[in-house]
Amino acid sequence: MLKNMKFKTSAFNIAQLLETEKKQIVLVGKSNVGKSSFINSLANQKHLAKVGNTPGKTKSINYYDVNNEFYIVDLPGYGYSNMTKVEKLNTSKLINHYIEKNENISHILFLVDIRHKPTENDRIMYDWLTSKNIPFTIIATKADKIGTTKQKENMQVITKVLFAKENIIPFSSSNKLNLDIIEN
């Protein structure tokens, strides 16, 4: 667990993005993939990041300070159909600007749901991340929802659909599966 992790601020538009020299580890993934639960697991706090039952809860870029040394940054999920076209466009611009203009991103954690085949949006995100030359790791969330054999099968599907060259780490916020590996 990351000690002394606390919420710092939210950015709903480009003007609100945090200007900092601190390194940033960024979470990306589709809506309802478990980014907020992932943050809560890292911090060993149940309510640090607000977890929603409906997709699209996070509509801002949220910064979490870790030991006053670096930030975990939670980006809004993509693929949420209940956003208006204007909201989708504004969110897309915000995310693009954040990643394109930010020289302090040290790593990206790309979260996918292990229970489901990656979507076209996941594939687009994977290709986009690959083009950015920023180190990233694929985290397959919600691993506790399926058995070990199914986890292995589904990780192969994820690898095949994304054409992923990276290792995929199965993760569960419920039983903290592989939390120690991810923290390192």
Feature map (PLM): residue ranges:
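Canonical P-loop GTPase G-domain recognition
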Residues: L2-Q16, D144-N184
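Short, well-ordered secondary-structure micro-motifs
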Residues: L18, N62, M83-T84, T119-R123, ...
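Conserved C-terminal guanine-recognition region of P-loop GTPase G domains, centered on the G4
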Residues: K93-N167
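Conserved G1/Walker A P-loop phosphate-binding module
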Residues: M1-V86
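Conserved nucleotide-binding/hydrolysis micro-motifs of P-loop NTPases
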Residues: K57, F70, G77-Y80, R115-K117, ...
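Amphipathic alpha-helical transducer elements in NTP-driven molecular machines
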Residues: K88-S92, T119, K176-L179
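Short, glycine/charged-enriched secondary-structure capping and boundary segments
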Residues: E21-K22, N40-A43, K85-K88, R123-D127, ...
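Structured catalytic cores of enzymes that bind and process phosphorylated ligands/cofactors
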Residues: I25-V33, I39, N62, N68-E69, ...
